[in-house]
Amino acid sequence: MMIEYLLGLLILIFPSVLAWGFIEVLDCQRVLTVLEKLPLAYLFGLGIVAWEMLVLQLLGKPFSPLWLLTPLLGASILFSAVYMRRKRHLKAKPQSQSPWLKEHWSKVDIFLLTGIGLELGFAFTRALLLPMEDFDAVTNWGLKAKAIYLANGIPLGFLTNREYATVHADYPLLLPLVESYVYFLLGHINDFAVKWIFPLSLTACVTAFYAGLRRMTLNRTAGLAFAFVLVSIPHLVFSATNAYADILIATYFGAGFFYLFLWIRQRNDLFLGLSALLTGMAGLTKSEGMVLCLVNLVVLMWAVNRERSVDRPHGWRQVLIYIGVFSTVLMPWLVFRLSMKAQNDYIHELRVERVVQWETVMRMKTILYHYQAQFFNLKSWNLLWLAALGLFLFRFKKILQSDQKFIFLATAMTLSFYTSVYFITFNDVAWHLKTSFSRLLVHFVPLVVLGFASAYLDSAQKD
């Protein structure tokens, strides 16, 4: 069993090595630190595997170790060659050597880092010891992964068979594809070997978050404090142990927004490119990811529209490039989905009369009840939502006058869309809220904590 665990980890590390080379090629000016490259390599590695498998499916090639590894090895050699060629002409910049690690470590820093380590350790322990047992982990993501492995490809007949009502053929396939990739290289199905994906995603989320805060000029202690706030949220940690896709989409969306927010503040085009790639991968992960792509795009358009008129044409060109990048990431999935004529359950069942009827309006009472039940659930969320409400009420004007308004816009748009689903759902709304709302909140938890950190930074700079 231990060997299977280690093999599963090594199989997931391999595409991360390839992604590291890809990041080195992108980072031609040596801007990123090692601490930033590590989570990016992991996240891009998963995305590259899913993207490659979708392309193989469209080309009619079977999923086998040979077909899976050959393109990855070829791309790895290509990226390495480009990187080595550039390295001879570039001098290393000081910031690329992670100067943050050389700072003095105070007792508070060590305490916070220990706390973060304990929370992550709990996530790894729980994820790796418990089997896949939660409903969607077994009947949706895990079932699709096993079907892909057994069929040596994505089985259209299985996905579109209405008898398998829990499958949701229209759901993006990043997670099932990555799980099946592990199965293919292992040579058999092993649910424990793929469970590395989830605590590693939480680790990547926290690391990318901390690195983003340091880029915003927060000192180490403050950065670690907010990273600890993020990783100490019980339901976020739980989502990294139950084999659901929510921790993945939270990480992709969160990291994509972090780099978009850094671009707004610093105007480094590398950050905008990273944001576009990560945002596109969020769209490959869950259906909600398509909306999250739109959220980041709206934030970018608003930021560009605020620029001086002389800079605005260049800004709109960057918007078009941003759309082009995340559309390239999404294209194989969109083409495949179109080819199998999959329909979204909610859109397919949506009727105008359902939206305008009085019963729909009366759902507000049920929705508000379940919202407050989550927001006051300190056991699952600590004081996160109450603190967020307090911050919004007491700093409303300052939020609108600073870059924090972009965080508020992204959070408000995401919550508004998710709320609209409960108004139009054809399921019993109370049941739907009980089974999904807590998971949807996970998606923008990193943005809320980023709002706290940004408010603290603005206050500290004024003082």
Task: Give each language-model segment a name.
Residues 1-100:
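Membrane-embedded, hydrophobic transmembrane alpha-helices
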Residues 31-40, 189-192, 209-232:
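Transmembrane-helix signature of polytopic, membrane-embedded enzymes
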Residues 63-123, 321, 395-409, 461-463:
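Start-transfer (signal-anchor) and selected internal transmembrane alpha helices
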Residues 75-85, 193-216, 255:
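Transmembrane-helix motifs of polytopic, lipid-linked glycan transferases
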Residues 102-107, 214-222, 267-269, 306-320, ...:
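Membrane-interface helix-loop-helix junctions at transmembrane boundaries of multi-pass membrane enzymes
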Residues 130, 298, 302-306, 315-397, ...:
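Membrane-lumen/periplasm interface segments of specific transmembrane helices
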Residues 180, 204-213, 373-408, 412, ...:
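Hydrophobic, aromatic-rich transmembrane alpha-helices
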Residues 226-228, 259-260, 264, 271-287, ...:
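Membrane-interface alpha helices of multi-pass inner-membrane proteins
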